[in-house]
Amino acid sequence: MSRHPFPRRLAAVVLGTTLVVAAAACGSGDDADAADGTVTLRFSYFTSEQNPIAQTWKQWMEEVTERSDGSIEFEQYWDGTLLGADEVVEGLVDGRADIAQVTPTFYPGRFALTAVNELPFGTNNVGAIASAMSTLVEEDEDLAEEWSSQDLVPLAWNVGGSSAIASNREIATAADFRGLKVRGLDRGSRALDANGANVIALAPTELYGSMDRGLIDAVYGVQFGALPSLKLEEISDYVVDASTGAQTASTLAMGQAAWDSLTDEQRAVIEEVSADAPSMYEAANRAAEEAACTAFAESGTELSVLAGAEVEKLRAAGQDVVVDGWLAEVEEAGHDGAAFRETYDAAVEAAAADFPDGDESGVARCLAKG
């Protein structure tokens, strides 16, 4: 059973599932299944199917089924009904799911190199980041080993857009973060912590209730277009883009055993569709941002972008703390973090040419519409 040499030109999105041979219509058992050649993959995703990432995965699955002439089908589980966000890696390896979105933020220390895209105050260009990660997981041996050593096959990358902080308190300056109870998980939230915020780790499914009951004042780490999928426009008085840059890169992945169980033809179809994933996600994300813009306008929520001088204050207090912590983690894993970051930055810069207008945030685009 050979290791998967990660697919050529993998894409920018994410999914999850458990490999099951589909039962034949006449139900005559294993012989009929083998003759039919159809597989049903259990797909798992830990939040709503209404957000732009989920919409991308739905389109991805439809395309895989169509292009495989029905030889690959999917049994879909949404809202964490099969695997929670922190259960995906083990669930893919032990076969509870065949394909699922792996979000490294939920696995501290296990994806140290991958977490380079969590370093704050970088680009908002999610397409460029996703494309760069697709390239690097093929070309960089250390990054590839980070995934293959855990029996995971990354297929398509997705990157959360620049975080729009939904809040019940106005945030107009860096000082406004002091004492603010903010939901946060990734390294960008640690920059807020360094500026005096009280960062609280909560799963997406806990956000509405926690904010509604006053357990938190604000939500960080959810892209602008996905906020309405959590109904946060109903309970947020303000949404501010703090210009911390794009968030965590996640990947649609399969366990190695499930991947090896597919035929060469089926794997080729998955690779082909994954190569189209960045454009799928770009379209879904822009549509979701437009819908979010409308939803927040209708709810009367005040949108803003933090002034550049205030962003610099956030950066001065938080960036070095976060970067130094990441470098130490990467060194502990046996890698040269500074060298890898240079490689990553160069890959993102090269990929940005294919996404020329990708650095403007969803909040900024919404405000520009007037």
Report the location of each language-model feature:
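N-terminal secretory/targeting leader peptides
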Residues: 2-8, 13-17, 21, 26-128, ...
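A gly/proline- and charged-residue-enriched helix-loop-helix capping module
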Residues: 124-144
